[in-house]
Amino acid sequence: MFLPMSHPAKRNVRRIGTWAALAALLMPAAALAGGLPPGFVYLRDIAPGIAQDMRYAGANNFTGRPLPGYDAAECVLRRAAAEALAKVQADLAAQNLGLKVYDCYRPMRAVAAFARWAQRADDGATKRFYPKLDKRQLFAGYIAAHSAHSEGIAVDLTLVPLPAPPAAPFDPRAAYGPCTAAAIARAPDNSLDMGTGFDCFDDKAHTANGTVTPDQARRRALLVAAMRGRGFRNYFREWWHFSFGARREAQDFPIRARR
């Protein structure tokens, strides 16, 4: 299931970088000025109650650093996807639950950066995200040459209790346990325990994995049902990943701070 990146895949990495560069040159003036292209919105403007923990805008991710294009820690989505998320948030409120997003729209340049990172020698600094795998095996089934995130129709998220407790700050120097460990041993997160951390490259992160506890399985099922009820589709290898609507054109505009 997990295979090393082949020579054609390496060529795809170069193509992604070229596409990202061309997209940047053709980027609408509004995006360059700090606005958003037509059809895209800041989730905070549609559903301000949804918590945001934008992992690729900081160091708490499997690359250990902010990703290109994440100039602000803001969730950006196609309007229809954002409005559907707002409905999920309202549905969950009756159970004293809410959503927390980890990633939304992802510039194409960030997808290219993932692939370049995978080909570099492994220094083990972020091994907690892939405890059982060789770094070169990470992207089969997880991160493709083309991501629905770049189309603005995919979102990575989890459940939080309401009111959500404050999360302890992430310490990049700390020796956190692997993403498959008990929640108390993993990097801090104020979400409900879903059995693994976000971006955990392991079979245990598969939505229907049978080794998680009954409570963890119930929470995953609850999240999937709530999202499905508003038109989202779950990716079976990642309990946190959902997409909405038809495929769209991939984008590369940077995520800038809201005006």
What is the predicted role of each segment?
Residues M5-A20:
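Bacterial N-terminal signal peptides that target proteins for export
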Residues G17-A29:
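Bacterial N-terminal signal peptides
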Residues L32-C104, M108-F129, L133-F236, R247-R259:
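Extracytoplasmic cell-surface/polysaccharide-interacting catalytic and binding patches
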Residues W239:
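Active-site lining segments that contact anionic ligands and/or coordinate catalytic metals
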